[in-house]
Amino acid sequence: MQRHAYICDAVRTPFGRYGGALSGVRADDLGAVPLAALMARHPGVDWQAVSDVIFGCANQAGEDNRNVARMSALLAGLPLEVPGATVNRLCGSGLDALGTAARAIKSGEAGLMIAGGVESMSRAPFVMPKAESAFSRSNAIYDTTIGWRFVNKLMKAQYGVDSMPETAENVAVEYKIEREAQDRMALSSQLKAVAAQKAGHLAREIVGVSIPQKKGDAILVDQDEHPRETSLEALA
């Protein structure tokens, strides 16, 4: 008989803007924050019983490149015996981590899992490939913030290598989604997010991130930076 999988608790850090308040925080340190908060919130849990920590991460080009799930688990203070694995399904990475954890529990392979994801586009590095020949004078540099890098020419010729924003534009053209309709949807989403934030609906799930300052006390970032007041005129 297949077992059921349940979400027992959920915590996260605030969503930060590109180059915003969280831009100075490494991805592995950021991933450790909710893990440490989860442990503090449930002191009665035997954390050695955790079968695995599964994190999704799409970039993996910089400070998040060496199995960031394991790095975050160690930094958070989870027992050394608890393993970690990082999955990459690009924008669906975090949700894929959740699915992987649920399947492990339902199959009987695991009893207690931690699943989530971490990303820092602000700290995505510029990268350079090695020269293909000795004393080569050619060079290339890739911004790993979003989209492809080290493009396979055969892949590009066969499928294209558009980034997610470019794909969104292509889909809008193909399905004749007018800009005004997109703006109305965006405005509705923003207004709901702002209302939820003001009402305090997100407070329980958010763990504040302490940002050290060169002078004075550290700043606690405990609200999403993304939701903001806007209008159809501003979006047009």
Task: Enumerate the language-model features and the residues they cover.
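N-terminal extracellular/periplasmic Venus flytrap/periplasmic-binding protein-like
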Residues: 12-13, 24-33, 44, 181-236
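Acidic, glycine-rich active-site loops and adjacent beta-strand->loop/helix elements
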Residues: 11-14, 56-60, 89-93, 117-122, ...
